[in-house]
Each structure stands twice: as structure tokens, then as C-alpha cells.
């Protein structure tokens, strides 16, 4: 399978790129800085996610696109300074989707977060208070905008909403259509779910919550 990744140098995107390449898929990725590109078996192309010409060039022959973008902060501290444009995720999918449609590429998987959109009230109160009163909220706002854009497309999309992400060396996951409370999942588990779902054809036009 030929896969294009947006967000391949982020922690979740990198896990997916590594797993997909190790599984003998042809993986390409648009990155802002090739200096952050560290996987030998991935075709990194330096450029802007807003560059339609570049997207058109890379989309030829692609079977699926995975979006693992986020609104970045200077650290994991919830109150750390934001260093990404506040609409990076939603603007990127707004540019991406028409290019996919033009090339007849139907399969899209986007990584969002548990608590986004209609799953907000299912989060524990403490988590909601932290998110709403910190800079994490800016990412949640843009993930929500991304989800709305994706849902209104004609693509075969799957929205992935992981619960709290960890760096554990585990690739197990539990996928549900619904909103479980709490829990955690490793980034490797998210990557494994995405690759499994691309191979199975399941969860078309569905929003899936992931936990361990």
C-alpha cells in the first residue's frame, strides 16, 4: 500500500510511519524540516501542508492518507507556549481533501482526541477542567474543526480519538464506537490500530475511541 502521512515527525505520526514502513508499505511524508526526519525507509518531502502543487505531486498513486497533526507547544506542560498556528490541523485537511478527491484517493484516517466534539462530556471532570483552562484547549478546538471538515467530505474517512497518550512500548488497543471514560493508550497502540484498519477496511465513516 502507498501511504501519505501528514504529521510524520510528531510522536504518534512517527510511530505510524515506522510501523507502516517496517510492514513493507511505501510511505511518503510532507515535513516542514527534513532535519527532523529520522526513518530511512520513509520518503520525506520538505514543504508546506498548504502547498496544493506539492500535494498534487505526491498524491499520484497513493492508496491512503493518514493525518496525525497537532497544535504543538514548547513542552508537554499544559500551559506551555503554543508554537503552531492555531488552525494548522483544520487548514491542512481543508487543503488536503479536495486534492484527494481530485485524484480519486478515498481512504483517510485522521487522529483526533478523546474529549473532542460530542465526546467532551464523557471525560472525567478533572480532565475537562485541566484541558479547558490550559493551552491544550487550543488543540481540542482545532481537532473539532478538523473533524467537522472530514465528516462533511465524501471520503472513506475514519476519525481516531485516543484517550490519554503514553510513550509505553505496547501496541495493544481496544477500539469502540462510543465514549469510554478515562484510561490511556500508547502511541504504538494508536499506530497499530491505524495500520490494522487500513488493511481491514473497517470503521468507514466512523469515529473510533481508542484505549488500551
Mark where each language-model region is:
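Conserved beta-loop-beta element that borders a ligand/cofactor-binding pocket
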Residues: 147-168
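Substrate-positioning beta->alpha
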Residues: 89, 142, 160, 185-195, ...
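Conserved Rossmann-fold NAD(P)-dependent oxidoreductase catalytic core, especially the SDR/UDP-sugar
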Residues: 34, 80, 91-138, 152
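NAD(P)H-binding glycine-rich loop region in Rossmannoid oxidoreductase-like domains
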Residues: 35-95, 99-102, 202
Amino acid at each position: 500500500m502507498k501511504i501519505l502521512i501528514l504529521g510524520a515527525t510528531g510522536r504518534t505520526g512517527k510511530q505510524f510511519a515506522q510501523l507502516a514502513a517496517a510492514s513493507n508499505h511505501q510511505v511518503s511524508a510532507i515535513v516542514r524540516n527534513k532535519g527532523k526526519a529520522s526513518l530511512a525507509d520513509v520518503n520525506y518531502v520538505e514543504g508546506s501542508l498548504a502547498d496544493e502543487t506539492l500535494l498534487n505531486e505526491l498524491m499520484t498513486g497513493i492508496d491512503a492518507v493518514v493525518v496525525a497533526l497537532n497544535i504543538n507547544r514548547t513542552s508537554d506542560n499544559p500551559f506551555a507556549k503554543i508554537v503552531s498556528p492555531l488552525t494548522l490541523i483544520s487548514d491542512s485537511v481543508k487543503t488536503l481533501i479536495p486534492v484527494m478527491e481530485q485524484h480519486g484517493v478515498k481512504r483517510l484516517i485522521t487522529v483526533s482526541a478523546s474529549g473532542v466534539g460530542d465526546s467532551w462530556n464523557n471525560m472525567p471532570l478533572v480532565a475537562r477542567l485541566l484541558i479547558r483552562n490550559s493551552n491544550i484547549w487550543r488543540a481540542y478546538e482545532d481537532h473539532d474543526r478538523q473533524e467537522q471538515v472530514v465528516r462533511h467530505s465524501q471520503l472513506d474517512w475514519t476519525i481516531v480519538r485516543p484517550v490519554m497518550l503514553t510513550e509505553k512500548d505496547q501496541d495493544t488497543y481496544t477500539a469502540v464506537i462510543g465514549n469510554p471514560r478515562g484510561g490511556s493508550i500508547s502511541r504504538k497502540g494508536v499506530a497499530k490500530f491505524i495500520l490494522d484498519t487500513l488493511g481491514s477496511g473497517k470503521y468507514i465513516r466512523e469515529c473510533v475511541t481508542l484505549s488500551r
